[in-house]
From Swiss-Prot:
Entry binding sites for substrate: R118, R152, E276, E277, R292, R371
Organism in which the protein naturally occurs: Influenza A virus (strain A/Memphis/110/1976 H3N2)
Positions of disulphide bridges: C92-C417, C124-C129, C183-C230, C232-C237, C278-C291, C280-C289, C318-C337, C421-C447
Gene: NA
Positions annotated with a glycan in the UniProt record: N61, N70, N86, N146, N200, N234, N402
Spans within the Virion surface topological domain: 31-469
SUPFAM superfamilies in the cross-refs: Sialidases
Identification of the protein by name: Neuraminidase
Length: 469
């Protein structure tokens, strides 16, 4: 090869290499520009349209680092669209209930700063469960805990902690309340908080940490609400509220709330005579509540709420094994689905039940006359057959020698079905335990299971003689 040919060959190779390098630089530039603009766009899986990221609620700010030769590009991954909960999955098929959580608040109060509380409940957002309670504005080892048996004071606040975390001094006080309900619509928490004078109380509606709406007492006689979770379906949350006599005719209303704003109010209709402290659960496309009749019945009222047209119906649980306390013994108790049974109807306790086809799962105190012990069972035909009494799958949650209290339901959405869970309030202190001057509680929580399970008893467990007076 002569010198001229060598020069031409070297030049051709150099030109080829230069061209390749030029094309690579163009590719890097195009990639950089594309990724820069795509960080502001998300593909919508519904219709393949491009949607801006900014209006979407970002739960986690994730950054992916992409390396191309010597160029570093930061690409923001668009978060999953947060949607309202619709609770359209079927209810889980269960054989009974398994232990889930216990906070041991009273035992811990013997040596730590734990809030004095009552009226606890549990509710979950799409990713985590929380426990709530109405605090008394004091810790247990504090002279302000004297005489905390009283239900309604201006110092009571709604407390919120992750489930299983006792209400310590760092606990968040969500709102001022001596009666409350809370629920998560898929986007944010709604808290319904009642406080004020007995004859002129106020219910505040707090959504996503902001006060959005309020309503005053309509019967001037202790406006009150559920003391357990409300339910939201497709952005509409329902809460049952009562104002009026605790031992006679009262005025119950069902409020429909969207992002904290009251959009409709429906009066109670149907055959229920007295409704308080409802334990509600989603029953798509509506909401179903099992409540307390504090006037005429030891059988529990049922309130069915139509979220679409705001209509209400009510009746009573058909099971002849009734759920309230006090009540007749199981041989003489009765319920015929439509009306209160007029059996030891005065007084009562918050409780729960839920339908399972024609059957009903329910919980109640073991004692027929006091808030002692706690049991659950299934009544065959208990949802559809008047005075049905065939009981199966009975479990003892708290033995009859130990105190219980309020109980309520909450729902947890799984991958394929909606599970029902319940909590039991374990009251300690006054009135029964007069060595101390305070009244407070801990909780135990169980959830439905399709598996097998054993036996036990899960009382509060604190030795009252070791507790601060």
């Amino acid at each position: 090869m002569n010198p001229n040919q060598k020069i031409i060959t070297i030049g051709s190779v150099s030109l080829t290499i230069a061209t390749i390098c030029f094309l690579m630089q163009i590719a890097i530039l195009v990639t950089t520009v594309t990724l820069h603009f795509k960080q502001y766009e998300c593909d919508s899986p519904a219709n393949n349209q491009v949607m801006p990221c900014e209006p979407i609620i970002i739960e986690r700010n994730i950054t992916e680092i992409v390396y191309l030769t010597n160029t570093t590009i930061e690409k923001e991954i668009c978060p999953k669209l947060v949607e309202y909960r619709n609770w359209s999955k079927p209810q889980c098929k269960i054989t009974g209930f398994a232990p889930f959580s216990k906070d041991n608040s009273i035992r811990l109060s013997a040596g730590g700063d734990i809030w004095v509380t009552r009226e606890p409940y549990v509710s979950c957002d799409p990713g985590k469960c929380y426990q709530f309670a109405l605090g008394q504005g004091t810790t247990l080892d504090n002279k302000h805990s004297n005489d905390t048996i009283h239900d309604r004071t201006p110092h009571r606040t709604l407390l919120m902690n992750e489930l299983g975390v006792p209400f310590h001094l760092g606990t968040r006080q969500v709102c001022i309340a001596w009666s409350s309900s809370s629920c998560h619509d898929g986007k944010a928490w709604l808290h319904v908080c009642v406080t004020g004078y007995d004859k002129n109380a106020t219910a505040s509606f707090i959504y996503d940490g902001r006060l959005v709406d309020s309503i005053g007492s309509w019967s001037q006689n202790i406006l009150r609400t559920q003391e357990s979770e409300c339910v939201c379906i497709n952005g509409t949350c329902t809460v049952v509220m009562t104002d009026g006599s605790a031992s006679g005719r009262a005025d119950t209303k069902i409020l429909f709330i969207e992002e904290g704003k009251i959009v409709h109010t429906s009066p109670l209709s149907g055959s229920a005579q007295h409704v308080e402290e409802c334990s509600c659960y989603p029953r798509y496309p509506g909401v179903r509540c099992i409540c307390r009749d504090n006037w005429k019945g030891s059988n529990r009222p049922v309130v069915d709420i139509n979220v679409k047209d705001y209509s209400i119906d009510s009746s009573y649980v058909c099971s002849g094994l009734v759920g309230d306390t006090p009540r007749n013994n199981d041989r003489s108790s009765s319920s015929y689905c439509r009306n209160p049974n007029n059996e030891k109807g005065t007084h009562g306790v918050k409780g729960w039940a839920f339908d399972d086809g024609n059957d009903v799962w329910m919980g109640r105190t073991i004692s027929e006359d006091s808030r002692s012990g706690y049991e659950t069972f299934k009544v065959i035909g208990g949802w559809s057959t008047p005075n049905s009494k065939l009981q199966i799958n009975r479990q003892v949650i708290v033995d009859s020698d130990n105190r219980s209290g309020y109980s309520g339901i909450f729902s947890v959405e799984g991958k394929s079905c909606i599970n029902r869970c319940f909590y039991v309030e374990l009251i300690r202190g006054r009135e029964q335990e007069t060595r101390v001057w305070w009244t407070s509680n801990s909780i135990v929580v169980f959830c439905g299971t399709s598996g097998t399970y054993g036996t036990g008893s899960w009382p509060d467990g604190a030795d009252i003689n070791l507790m601060p007076i």
